[in-house]
Amino acid sequence: MDITKTQHGLRMSQHGTVISELRTSPGPTDSVADILAGLICVLKPEGRIGVLGFAGGGMQAPLCALGVEAKVDAVDLDRVGYDLFRWHCPEWVRRVRWKKADAVKWLRAQPADFDLIVEDLSVPSEGDVFKPGITWDVLPPLIRDRLAPGGIAVFNLLPPPGGGWLRERNRMARMFRDARLVSFDDFTNHILVAGRSVPPVRELGKMLRHALRTIGSVQAERIRLRTVRGSRPTVF
């Protein structure tokens, strides 16, 4: 893991790929973390929030800027990011219940009481960063089964090494009753938002962009949303 100082905090990278922008004060990271934080803000989970993959706590600065005070249960096998977070953002540590553990084993031991689960795992491979294989097969049904009634899953996806991006993504969406997709101008990531009932695509897009503009994130104007399921996807 390479750690570089930035104007607002630290940048964590592997093999030249940025893993996380860790701000030490409330505000935007201008990265995918802003969208993940924005979704937590606009979806307004009232109960438990789970985060699989901590990435140095990059979501905390935009969450604080958005006024979100909810605590999250976070799990990761790599302790380096959490230790950096504790050292550089001590006032935010109380907002995170972190555990070093395998995400699948940890989630299997949890009750089905999550209002929202964010899947944000990644692994380095051959000079790049990819999603682990469990993202595409083991985790989607497990996450679905650990959601409370009305709970929503948020998957931060990257193209798999062997291709099959569209097929795998749509297969994941079909495990849920309703799904939306967020894509980016700046990143190859896609964010899948899925559950029994997800806000309509226009409503979700409007709320998400408003939240991002509130904190001054450049991503407010660089995202697109659409409905994944249905005979004719709606783009907004």
Task: Show where each model-derived region lies.
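C-terminal substrate-binding/active-site "lid" region of AdoMet-derived donor-dependent transferases
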Residues: 128-131, 137-201
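A short, flexible beta-alpha/helix-coil linker loop
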Residues: 17-20, 122-128, 153
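The AdoMet/dcAdoMet-binding core of the Class I SAM-like
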Residues: 2, 7, 25-146, 162-163, ...
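A generic structural signal for alpha->beta connector loops
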Residues: 69-71, 93-95, 150, 176-178, ...
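SAM/dcSAM-binding transferase cores
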Residues: 1-7, 11-31, 38-42, 189-236
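A general structural signal for short secondary-structure boundary/capping elements
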Residues: 53-56, 161-165, 201-204, 225-226
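Generic structural signal for hydrophobic
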Residues: 63, 172, 231-233
